[in-house]
Amino acid sequence: MSTPQIDVAYIAKLARIDLTEEETALFSKDLDKVLAYITKLESYDVTGIAPMNHPLPAMDVMREDIPETGFTQEEALSNAPQQSQGQFRTPKVVESA
């Protein structure tokens, strides 16, 4: 499959890339190789093969999510330097307007 040089020149023009004649010829050959590879891939029979995103099977490396009981409110507030109405009390960091 051959790709005319005008295609490479047209693509370069659309991308606003200035190519020399040598670069146009080089990219034309490279494009021919890519299209030949695609043609070769199209010849393979892949019926019955499931599509995949990665060649290795995906596995979950995270632990299973098992609910556990946490601290009670009293336990959480037991080491707080200041508390008020069952909540942590902190110094004021935002001034009123």
Curated annotation (Swiss-Prot):
It catalyses: L-glutamyl-tRNA(Gln) + L-glutamine + ATP + H2O = L-glutaminyl-tRNA(Gln) + L-glutamate + ADP + phosphate + H(+); L-aspartyl-tRNA(Asn) + L-glutamine + ATP + H2O = L-asparaginyl-tRNA(Asn) + L-glutamate + ADP + phosphate + 2 H(+). GO terms for molecular function: asparaginyl-tRNA synthase (glutamine-hydrolyzing) activity; ATP binding; glutaminyl-tRNA synthase (glutamine-hydrolyzing) activity. GO terms for biological process: glutaminyl-tRNAGln biosynthesis via transamidation; regulation of translational fidelity; translation. The keyword ATP-binding applies. Keywords: ATP-binding, Ligase, Nucleotide-binding, Protein biosynthesis. It is an enzyme of class 6 (ligase). Residues 68-97 are annotated as: Disordered. Transmembrane segments: none annotated. The keyword Cell inner membrane does not apply. Heterotrimer of A, B and C subunits. Belongs to the GatC family. HAMAP family: GatC. This is Aspartyl/glutamyl-tRNA(Asn/Gln) amidotransferase subunit C. It comes from Akkermansia muciniphila (strain ATCC BAA-835 / DSM 22959 / JCM 33894 / BCRC 81048 / CCUG 64013 / CIP 107961 / Muc). The gene is gatC.
